[in-house]
């Protein structure tokens, strides 16, 4: 896959290296020459200095034939503009955008060209909740702009659901159990 990453900070550089190691072709764009210079061009990673909010820079990066654009700068407004241009001007099939300020999370939707938003503050809050709670529900991920999600439920000692079959539990109709962790082993329900 060809992936264009807007933002060569620590997040963008890490993503570029990991995705390139998985066999993807990566183009990284950043306005800051020092950020671009920290990324070495290889057979699978190309770096480009420029403003990813500009159509001509996205054109030079090959956004028109990208499978994914990831807008991961440290600026929410830039990430939204990059997402909108990627989707509207270039028809990129999948646009992922980083949310820096949780107050801006509501804007990261299809109207702005965002297919998947990643909110670091939101994810960290979920991880902290998971670390400090027991016998409760922790939201892990949100899909389709909050219409559905993935949650982890930890059963407290003495819960009536312990040792029951999934079929015998009275779960909401819209809920699906995708995995059970029992004694450290993952069990996928049939």
Model-identified regions with their sequence ranges:
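Cytosolic regulatory regions of ion transport systems
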Residues: 1-190
């Amino acid at each position: 896959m060809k992936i264009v990453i807007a933002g060569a900070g620590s997040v963008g550089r890490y993503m570029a290296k990991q995705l390139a190691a998985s066999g993807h072709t990566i183009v990284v764009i950043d306005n800051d020459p020092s950020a671009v210079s920290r990324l070495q061009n290889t057979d699978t990673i190309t770096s480009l200095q420029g403003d990813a909010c500009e159509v001509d820079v996205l054109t030079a990066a090959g956004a028109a034939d990208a499978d994914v654009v990831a807008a991961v700068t440290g600026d929410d407004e830039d990430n939204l503009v990059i997402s909108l241009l990627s989707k509207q001007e270039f028809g990129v099939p999948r646009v992922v955008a980083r949310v820096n300020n949780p107050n801006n999370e509501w804007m990261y939707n299809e109207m702005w060209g965002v297919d998947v938003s990643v909110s670091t503050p939101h994810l960290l809050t979920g991880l902290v909740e998971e670390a400090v709670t027991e016998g409760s529900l922790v939201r892990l991920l949100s899909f389709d702009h909050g219409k559905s999600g993935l949650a982890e439920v930890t059963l407290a000692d003495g819960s009536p659901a312990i040792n029951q079959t999934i079929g015998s539990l009275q779960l909401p109709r819209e809920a699906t159990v995708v995995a059970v962790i029992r004694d450290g082993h993952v069990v996928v329900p049939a």
